[in-house]
Amino acid sequence: MAERAARHCCLGWDFSTQQVKVVAVDAELSVFYEDSVHFDRDLVEFGTQGGVHVHKDGLTVTSPVLMWVQALDIILEKMKASGFDFSQVLALSGAGQQHGSVYWKTGASQVLTSLSPDLPLREQLQACFSISNCPVWMDSSTAAQCRQLEAAVGGAQALSLLTGSRAYERFTGNQIAKIYQQNPEAYSHTERISLVSSFAASLFLGSYSPVDYSDGSGMNLLQIQDKVWSQACLGACAPRLEEKLGRPVPSCSIVGAISSYFVQRYGFPPECKVVAFTGDNPASLAGMRLEEGDIAVSLGTSDTLFLWLQEPTPALEGHIFCNPVDPQHYMALLCFKNGSLMREKIRDESASGSWSKFSKALQSTGMGNSGNLGFYFDVMEITPEIIGRHRFTAENHEVSAFPQDVEIRALIEGQFMAKKIHAEALGYRVMPKTKILATGGASHNRDILQVLADVFGAPVYVIDTANSACVGSAYRAFHGPSLLCLVSIY
């Protein structure tokens, strides 16, 4: 009996831009199974590149909804063929690429509730969507709708205070507004609009899953303080939108038991719980086990900051989301476009292309760089919108060049100081227990991490986040049915 109990597990799913991935995590929170389906490689018939279709205008970016459905079919069949024991799954949860939206056609809910276990999902859901190619987070075609939304609520700052972000082209409310304006017939035939996360949860539930607070915060529609849809924002985007979205729920809600389709076809236990799916960034916060006061810094092509906040102050830069782990708290996301490519450029220019020389320059210059400060934006930055290289001496005079060692420290200190300043603008404060979790390419350079620790005044730890959204979803599946989160709409 003990041996059987030891195999109890939760599943974490990730419906990301390029693949669907699953992990199984046991009661000790150890990953013992993982698998994935890569869209470009395993579903070539959909003709995606990087999991998406970029349209002729260069701005519209979509993904075929049936590709996501078929990927789930394939991965479950792979698990079955490998002998995976579905009967041991206590609960499951998942993540979806943020902001993307799915449009269920009138009558789709009846199909979802009466699926035949003899047929794959794709075959049965083929006619269930009013929009076959779904807008995703890479889409930037809704500038007009963004301006309309901001104007409707009194400007960008007013929208940010209300929903956690100013209007962004990828945010779901603006995408819905575009579909309503350009394809009103498809909109009128839509009975439910899901995020990618709640769409995936709906497949497992066999009925429409609600949008969770955390992923719902990336829509420009949810009032993040009151956790309700903003009537002003809904009205600015499309008619009858509230009924198409349904009521949002806390991210740790148990939204139901698994559909009988999965019980009969794969052998899931009928009591297997489905915990609300959320966005990939909120799920990553759970996967990295961030706590209040902590920061996660991803140092990649672009640099991303994840912050746990108690009292947020939304600003024009960055995003505030409801926290996926603690419904009373918040998380912030800050993206900086000039990340590793900028560091590599300065390495090439000032350290002969050598990371070893780059590190020696950081070691040979003092903290504070004798008052010399630099900001380096070779591509248009998004936090804030600025371009160019800007160097200042201790006397606050702008200069055109620094000595090589000074240049290297100015770059790294400037990058991390900007992160701290923008984090504090969103309400973040370093606490005595604060820890910084670093990931990405530059996290392998101890001297860069030392500057990060010096700027924030907190210890830095390097973590592996290869599966953080997936693993975070499995952790959340354990978290949902536990006493840690007494929220259930089941």
Curated annotation (Swiss-Prot):
InterPro entries: ATPase_NBD (IPR043129), Carb_kinase_FGGY (IPR000577), D-XK_euk (IPR042024), FGGY_C (IPR018485), FGGY_N (IPR018484). Keywords: ATP-binding, Carbohydrate metabolism, Kinase, Nucleotide-binding, Transferase, Xylose metabolism. SUPFAM superfamilies: Actin-like ATPase domain. One of its GO terms (cellular component) is cytosol. Its EC number is 2.7.1.17. ATP binds at W355, G441, A442, N445. One of its GO terms (molecular function) is ATP binding. Substrate binds at H99, R170, D280, N281. Pfam families: FGGY_C (PF02782), FGGY_N (PF00370). Monomer. This is Xylulose kinase. It comes from Bos taurus (Bovine). The lineage of its organism: Eukaryota, Metazoa, Chordata, Craniata, Vertebrata.
